[in-house]
Amino acid sequence: MAKYTRGTVTAFSPFDARADAEALRKAMKGMGTDEETILKILTSRNNAQRQEIASAFKTLFGRDLVDDLKSELTGKFETLMVSLMRPARIFDAHALKHAIKGAGTNEKVLTEILASRTPAEVQNIKQVYMQEYEANLEDKITGETSGHFQRLLVVLLQANRDPDGRVDEALVEKDAQVLFRAGELKWGTDEETFITILGTRSVSHLRRVFDKYMTISGFQIEETIDRETSGDLEKLLLAVVKCIRSVPAYFAETLYYSMKGAGTDDDTLIRVMVSRSEIDLLDIRHEFRKNFAKSLYQMIQKDTSGDYRKALLLLCGGDDE
């Protein structure tokens, strides 16, 4: 596994799983619940340590920590604490399973995860999905989606993006021209061309293609996608382009729109804050401040409340004002 160092949550030291398990049991035993203790422990330990705490909790008390959290806590705060307890290994597979379960498909989750994860991460998600749920993720997704949106999801699921290496300028020029002809210069749009190029070329190659495209056409590739496509395909193509440019900037924007305007998309807020907390949340905070003229910390503070807010702010790990 790649070693990530840009997270806000790191291994806590000195760590004592038994002491943490005892403190959590005490916080939930008897009348009332000590939410403060729960949120302080769970947001300051990394995911591997949380699994050790759960194991110690089972050994000491014969109880399931997640079940106890579910019975003692409620609402968004409960969802956040339970998400923090989910083993990192299965986090994405679990989110995808729930995105394609029951009535209606949550295209937003499919888009966010499959556009932003590396090929190695996607391969891992597919394996975990099969192990945990005894089902083929690609089959499940194709059963719930259709059209060009489905085609691009399938391409991304193959995790066959070219590895980064020396960029061939002739191929950059060719791809930029082909994209221009497939969209702006054509009556209608050749979606397959966008899907193939954006779904399979290397990150460094595509960054050059986007620059070249701007030179040739006078448009940012995002403007063309916006004009030439619509619906779920448009959202997925845009997410892929944004992640090719910068994954932290993509997540900064995702977090911003989860809180902007009336109401909050708490599912997205929780999913991103938890899943990126040990990977690149420091970089996401930096991009957030740069692109939205306010800090992620301030926006969370303004948009949420109670123990839920306290826990999110601890995960955020600091203000960038």
From Swiss-Prot:
Protein's recorded name: Annexin A5
A GO BP annotation: calcium ion homeostasis
Keywords, sorted A to Z: Annexin, Calcium, Calcium/phospholipid-binding, Repeat
Highest taxon of the lineage: Eukaryota
GO cellular component: calcium channel complex; cytoplasm; sarcolemma; vesicle; vesicle membrane
Residue spans crossing the bilayer: none
Annexin repeats, residue ranges: 15-86, 87-158, 170-242, 246-317
Gene3D superfamilies recorded: Annexin (1.10.220.10)
PROSITE patterns, per the entry: ANNEXIN_1, ANNEXIN_2
InterPro entries: Annexin, Annexin_repeat, Annexin_repeat_CS, Annexin_sf, ANX5
Domain statement: A pair of annexin repeats may form one binding site for calcium and phospholipid.
One of the record's GO molecular function terms: phosphatidylserine binding
Family statement drawn from the similarity comment of this UniProt entry: Belongs to the annexin family.
Species this chain originates from: Gallus gallus
Gene: ANXA5
Keyword match Cell membrane: no
Function (record text): Collagen-binding protein.
Keyword Repeat recorded: yes
